[in-house]
UniProtKB/Swiss-Prot annotation:
Gene: HTK16
CDD domains for this protein: PTKc_Syk_like (cd05060), SH2_Cterm_shark_like (cd10348), SH2_Nterm_shark_like (cd10347)
Protein's UniProt name: Tyrosine-protein kinase HTK16
Species annotation: Hydra vulgaris
The keyword Protease belongs to this UniProt entry's keyword annotation: no
Key words of the record: ANK repeat, ATP-binding, Kinase, Nucleotide-binding, Phosphoprotein, Repeat, SH2 domain, Transferase, Tyrosine-protein kinase
């Protein structure tokens, strides 16, 4: 038996409570001695029986579906193995931590996040349909068809990644769960979209009844997001043929079209833009009520027998464009706000966007998609009950402002992000009084959870408390607008400009400065990020990092930084290649590693390390700049998970950052390797003319940038170590800095550095 399987021997199957007590007492042990058994009352639940102070206590482990488990109201875990691992570290409601287990048998592999590699997994990996067919004749193997491998994959996930339709069909016939999630939170549908297996996708939905609206717990993507990001146009077509919503939103607020645009899949963008919008199947006369409050809605639904799925929609008297869906489920009424942006995009909570209210109703009549049940029985108003209901509404009948056939676009051609409406128990009057002016305010992004229950410090949170913290910290170094004068523009970007200026310090000294400003149309969106960047920089003090002198609150808001005279390293590399020696490149590499080591110690991740963001003070000194994407990581965590969308520099990003939005010092190390490559190619674009999507595919197939002509073998080996697929096997910045400080290969750098001190 393998070491991995030995760790899973805590399961005792269908033993009774009394037998569990006898087994634990007979085996003996200290506090925290435990076993897991089946729950007699609930077939999908389990029971934790454990010893504490010579007594045996029992705790029901509730199965919440989707291989998720929890004890009472405690944390939710994917897999029993993750639940046990957690309670071995912290008691968190149990009388003590779990310690040793009473040896039983192998736990059910379908109830784990990380199981064992079975013969079925291996046969699927080898694409051997005959072996798979033979194995599925075994009743035990068939019963465990949803078992997870040591990598957290079901057999169906493996075959879907291969696009092996014959094996997929056999697995579905054997009862494979077409909506199960793997260790990365992806369903088989998301896997086939990732690998662009359109025929397999059709098979999963048509034969396996796969849930193609299921969201990834990591980023909130549905399969259409995955297909759009990968440029899998045929998969996009299949999903839309099954009436998938065109505009679901991720946790970042991105629609599939947004991702297609970000990853330069312009054929997918064009397809979305030209896809015909179907006429809605329902009419507002079937379910819309005017001048109706919550109590009135309840009375109408009670008179309509309160059948599950009965519903109506009522408009707000005070706030035009807002609606409330009142839905009956198990004799209770549920109220969901329906918001819209400029009477155009309608949505419930973090659900998809719809071009009209009837389109929203159509969707939820077909898919519950977060609601407690389908919309089934529309209840018309008294006025409309007296007239025949039209089978299909026309635009004139809608009596609602008709939106354009495609998403609203902002100046960048991107669909505008929409807010996350809170579910509330307030009265309708309170809701809409509070929201009356919200349409004029900047719309918030969707929240997403902090990883591993580790709270990111307030200073980097997006919420109101975090905003106030940022403002308070920034105001410690306020610079009056009257004390600065503006000079020439040094550079311009998507969100703002950098302007050379002079600051008259409180001591009366004139100091040359660089001032970062926002474009007028980016004021609302960018001010919070400016404050965030100011907060990050205010906590840093290092010779290899650009210093923040203060913040001018304006208007406009300005970040006032030290002026780094020679500008971006990228420009210098391209413009002055003949003047740059190998020792210069090595010196700069050592200084960048030194500055990043400092960030590593301060528990910051930069997230945008690139030659364009390294500035030259002089030929002998570089400084790391541009902390607009930088984030702190919480105590007890080594990584940060992105909460915001936007355009990411994919060419500089590690695979885990591209795929899962996970950033750490180790993802910064990957970017450091790309920056080294830029330096030794004198400013070449990483991956040349590849699109963002092609870069992702190149990396997944173990592709790496080639050695630059002017790069020593030893330095290229450092780059390759930075690009290891396993983040834990990449060097730390401390190790990188040590290499430049102690390795004989870089003796010339140390001599040069000592000479210029």
């Amino acid at each position: 038996m393998s070491k991995n399987s030995d760790a899973l021997l805590w399961y005792h199957g269908k033993i009774t409570r009394e037998v569990a007590v006898q087994v634990l007492l007979r085996k003996g042990g200290r506090d925290g001695f435990f076993l897991i058994r089946d729950c007699g009352n609930a077939p999908e639940d389990y029971v934790l029986s454990m010893m504490f102070r010579s007594q045996i206590l029992h705790f029901q482990i509730n199965c919440l579906g989707d291989n998720k488990f929890s004890i009472d109201n405690g944390p939710i875990f994917q897999g029993l193995d993750m639940l046990i691992s957690y309670y071995k570290v912290i008691s968190d409601g149990l009388p003590c931590k779990l310690v040793d287990f009473c040896v039983g048998k192998i736990a059910p592999l379908y109830a784990l996040k990380y199981g064992l590699d079975t013969r079925l997994h291996l046969a699927c990996e080898e694409k051997n349909p005959n072996t798979v067919k033979e194995l599925l004749q075994d009743s035990v193997i068939k019963e465990n068809v949803n078992a997870r491998s040591i990598s957290g994959l079901t057999a169906l996930h493996i075959s879907c990644s291969n696009g092996d339709n014959d094996i997929v069909a056999m697995l579905l016939n054997a009862g494979a769960d077409a909506s199960a999630i793997d260790a990365n939170g992806r369903t088989p549908v998301q896997v086939v979209c990732f690998y662009n297996h359109a025929s397999t996708l059709h098979l999963l939905i048509s034969k396996g009844s796969a849930d193609f609206l299921k969201r990834s717990p990591n980023n909130g993507w549905v399969p259409l997001h995955e297909a759009a990001m990968r440029g899998s146009l045929e998969c996009v077509k299949v999903l839309l043929s099954f009436n998938a919503s065109m505009y679901p939103r991720s946790l970042d607020g991105d629609t599939p079209r947004d991702l297609a645009l970000q990853y330069e899949n312009y054929n997918v963008v064009e397809f979305f833009d030209n896809y015909p919008v179907n006429q809605p199947k329902t009419s507002i006369t079937q379910w819309l009520h005017q001048n109706l409050d919550r109590n009135g809605a309840l009375i109408i639904l009670q008179n309509a027998s309160m059948a599950d799925g009965s519903f109506l929609i009522r408009s707000s008297i005070k706030c035009h464009g807002y609606y409330v869906l009142t839905l009956v489920y198990e004799k209770k009424t549920y109220h969901f706000q329906i918001k819209s942006r400029a009477d155009r995009w309608f949505y419930i909570d973090d659900g998809p966007l719809f071009e009209t209210l009837p389109h929203l109703v159509d969707h939820y009549m077909q898919y519950a998609d977060g609601l407690p049940t389908l919309l089934q029985f529309p209840v018309p108003s008294a006025e409309n009950r007296k007239r025949p209901l039209p089978p299909t509404p026309t635009k004139n009948q809608l009596k609602l402002p008709v939106p354009p056939s495609r998403p609203i676009k902002n100046n960048n051609g991107l669909p505008q992000p929409l807010p996350y409406p809170e579910f509330t128990n307030e009265s309708d009057s309170d809701i809409f009084t509070r929201l009356e002016c919200e349409k004029e305010k900047p719309l918030p992004k969707l929240p997403r959870p902090v990883v591993n229950h580790t709270e990111v410090p307030n200073s980097v949170n997006v919420g109101q408390k975090g905003d106030q913290t940022m403002k308070n910290n920034a105001q410690q170094n306020i610079i009056l607008k009257e004390s600065i004068s503006f000079g020439k523009e040094l550079g311009v970007g998507e969100f703002g400009s950098v302007i050379k200026g002079i600051w008259l310090s409180p001591g009366g000294k004139e100091i040359n400065v660089a001032m970062k400003t926002l474009h007028k149309d980016k004021m609302v969106q960018g001010e919070k990020e400016f404050l965030r960047e100011a907060l990050v920089m205010s906590q840093l003090n290092h010779p290899c990092i650009v210093s923040l002198l203060g913040v001018c609150l304006g208007p406009p808001m300005i970040l006032v930084q030290e002026l780094v005279e020679m500008g971006a390293l990228l420009d210098y590399l391209m413009d002055y290649q003949p003047e740059i020696q190998e020792v210069d490149l090595k010196l700069w590499a050592s200084q960048i590693a030194f500055g990043m080591m400092y960030l590593e110690l301060k528990r910051f991740v930069h997230r945008d390390l690139a030659a364009r963001n390294i500035l030259l003070a002089n030929k002998k000194q570089v400084k790391i700049s541009d902390f607009g994407l930088s984030r702190a990581v919480g105590t007890g965590s080594d990584y940060y998970q992105a909460k915001q969308g936007g355009r990411w520099p994919v060419r500089w990003y590690a695979p885990e950052s591209i795929n899962y939005g996970t950033f750490s010092t180790k993802s910064d190390v990957w970017s450091y390797g790309i920056t080294l490559w830029e330096m030794f190619t004198f400013g070449d674009l990483p991956y040349g003319e590849m699109t963002g999507n092609e870069v992702v595919s190149f990396l997944e197939h173990c592709g790496r940038l080639e050695k630059p002509d002017e790069c020593p073998i030893h330095t290229y080996s450092i780059m390759l170590s930075c690009w290891h697929i396993d983040p834990n096997k990449r060097p730390t910045f401390n190790e990188l800095h040590s290499t430049f400080s102690t390795d004989p290969e870089y003796e010339d750098v140390r001599i040069y550095r000592d000479r210029i001190k």
